[in-house]
């Protein structure tokens, strides 16, 4: 296939290039249907229009052509080479086109039926700016919208790959990239940021941009300045030393309340004795935030953990309407005011690395219940009446050189590999790791190997020999429905209307589990480690399942626990369908 360079443009200090592969008149790009806000709110069953497919972050496809009865007939139908770097990506599918995000602001458009290339877009980054991982892109109108490694919000034409607009958020060389990409609702592009110390407090923000023009609409900081609400929770820590409350995963959006629901990360340094004292809350780290989508105002917050160990809580929040009847035989912490069986609009799931499931009232942030999954030793108790989380004081640090065995470790437990929710079973499904770490307190936060004030080493959870596990947990009762375990680490998963859970692992296995029992119904072994988010989509009435391989932070860490398992990590998209 001949490669044609059709556009080079210089904007400020950024050079943007587009490489397009020539296509015939039948290319799906010519028949592209613009994506509306209504389509994002209620996607066509065959489409995958955003990170977790829907604004409520379910990670659920209603497609059922591939199901428990015929999944054994699944076979690979095409694959497509991806770009270099961490391949932690989620492909989008619309109008018969698959859009594949790659590390370093490289986006590919391919025919979703065949894998044939349509166009490729590659940003030329300024000197000194490294390529960031790109877990998600967004689609609106006729544009693909993303957050770049050099701190731009930008849009490209979904039909041609040409740049449509771009808007600077910060200086290109400040380490405050988005990490996971945007979510779009009601014409607004919502994006969080990771924010390392060199950027200062003003890079720890959530932003909203106009999807049509790229104009910034608002930005909200996640660390208060003196005189602002929450300032007192930092004690006497000067504002220039308040670092790194990031929002490095994709938010959810509550249509009914017009609120952005997003999670936050740890501070830098993590040990709080270095940061004003172990008794301080340091808002809004490791919290769920509900923001007014029109103004960015924080409506409410709930803090999941005062974090001394880099156990971030930025992961997907599932927005679910369900009866709430936590079973005290399995659910450790329950709000005593809760009336069992009452129907509530909740935020649920595993928001942080601890692997603890939290269920909150979606409108107020009220704590309803919580339970652990994999072994954890950092939370001592949660006050059911107030929702206050009490950490085990024996696990905190008090001086340089203090060493602790911390479970889970910074790899989780839970990490960016997303879980899913199935409305068919009212059950949530989560890929987790049985991993802990030894952690020694240090003080040199400017050293990139010690940036969180910790020197760490991964170890297996005591008594465990299987790294990877998938937990199925009832959204109503909190009971474990089933648990699947295996030697290699688990990667993201997706649930489908066919009663299936598709999940990959660090070894390269791609599995289909029965959503009701956890039984393995089908599996295939790919040449490389699974690294991306699987999706299900349909074109011309035919259902497909896609997943990418390559290198990833979670997969690489899990592999340290299984040195006997050898696998490559070449980035590639694989697509399957029924024979």
Regions found by a protein language model. Name each.
Residues 7-17:
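Bacterial N-terminal signal peptides
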